[in-house]
């Protein structure tokens, strides 16, 4: 944005600062879930509930010998899914442009009339689509906990953590118990 446009902003939706009357963006087109990517990373790229695997992982949780091994596996999964979210956002963007004309909105957005184009066909001064990532903080907390509890302090093994995750921390016959690991 220009400095002047950046100073004349409002919040679009929940979080997106936007210059008023000058934007044709669609916000929250896709919602990449970082916590789901973490779950896939811990299960060799497979969804533990469905068994579906879109991106082959670098192994299961118990296969990671170092924290760096885990980080590389997570990056691989995250890059795969973010790439596909961008593709999905672009498809949504093109679909809106081709299938959903919006002449009224175009009439009140600066530059559309001067350019002779609708808001989604290049009429607005600014036009973009952005996904709203979810689960980032939960994912970061889980990764920090994994690093500290398993790799840095060795309080539990990867096998113990895997069992606790697979049993939803409900197995109280292990030492430590699932509940103790959860806390």
For each feature predicted by the language model, list its residue ranges.
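Conserved catalytic cores of very large enzyme subunits
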Residues: 1-183
